[in-house]
Structure formats: C-alpha cells, structure tokens
Amino acid sequence: MRHQLRVPLLSKPADQRKALLRALTTQLIREGRITTTKARAKALRNEAERMISLAKEGTLSARRRALGYIYDKKLVHSLFEKAQERYGERNGGYTRIVRTVARKGDNAQMAIIELV
C-alpha cells in the first residue's frame, strides 16, 4: 500500500529515478525553464529548491553537497555566485509550474517548470 509514501516513484527503479532527477535539476538550473511531464515537474521542484537553498546558504559544506548532486561543476559555482542576489529576500518558492497542453503521442499531462 502507498500510505505515507512521500517520494514520487515516477515508474522507475531508485537508481534511475535519482539519476533522472539529478539530470533534470542540472538542466533546469542551466536553462532556467524546461518542459517535462507534470509528475516529473512536481518531483523536480523539491530537488531544485533544495539546491537553491544550499546556494543561498553559501557555506563550504553546502557547496560540496551541491557539487555531489549537480553534474556540472561550473554550473554550481555560477549558481552560488548568483543565488544570494537573485533569491536573497525570498524564503522558498523559487520555482513555478505551469500546465501546458497534453503530449500528442501518449496524452501525458505536460508542464513547464521555471525558476522565478
């Protein structure tokens, strides 16, 4: 039964799900906006906000944790440089999810997730 299950499974084994979320988080931080399915966007929101919160913290341990999660080292450094000025006064809510039209092939609900 799914009682109290807080992690969205996304129909993938744990290793594939973690790799997918890491890749989506890296792409979102690099591009600022990506189009994906609604379920993936909701799962991605938690990870992206966690990385931005680490960047706002700005400590060495936070930087090392972000380097262990985000695939691109240069992207982590640029995130840590820009996060404090961009999100300094904001306490959470760094992303926005906007629903779009369903995907043509399988009618999956699509969404655009973007950094605010």
UniProtKB/Swiss-Prot annotation:
SUPFAM superfamilies: Prokaryotic ribosomal protein L17 (SSF64263). The keyword Cytoplasm does not apply. Transmembrane segments: none annotated. One of its GO terms (molecular function) is structural constituent of ribosome. Keywords: Ribonucleoprotein, Ribosomal protein. Disulfide bonds: none annotated. GO terms for biological process: translation. Pfam families: Ribosomal_L17. One of its GO terms (cellular component) is cytosolic large ribosomal subunit. Part of the 50S ribosomal subunit. Contacts protein L32. Belongs to the bacterial ribosomal protein bL17 family. This is Large ribosomal subunit protein bL17. The lineage of its organism: Bacteria, Bacillati, Cyanobacteriota, Cyanophyceae, Synechococcales. The gene is rplQ.
